[in-house]
Amino acid sequence: MATPTRAIVYWEGDSRDVLKTWPRDVQRDFGLSLRKLQDGERPTLDARPMQSVGQGVFELKAEDEAAWYRVIYLRIEDTIYVLDSFTKKTRKTEKNDLNRARARLSNLKLRLQKEKIDAKRKSDK
């Protein structure tokens, strides 16, 4: 039986840099959840759909005494795209965080569409 391939993780914008500023244990928790997602398993952290950002977009959630930590991601086939990472201090997600994730999703879709067109042109030659 073939071993399933692990999904690749792509970090959009500064999402990885932001996560790297978080406390080590929080980074580890998100790393473990992303690894589970890569392997096609359920994440260890709480996750919920983020329809307000886009179809198929999810939010991983963790917290400590200092803040609430969020990673917004989308899985397309064998790739996980981390659209945004941010912290928040209130229950409400800030509009600028949602808008940034939406903009990155829009840019991602355009980029993937362009890559598909370029690949088709290349194969037609």
Model region roles, listed by residue range:
Residues 1-68, 76-80, 87-125:
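Basic, Lys/Arg-enriched alpha-helical interface segments
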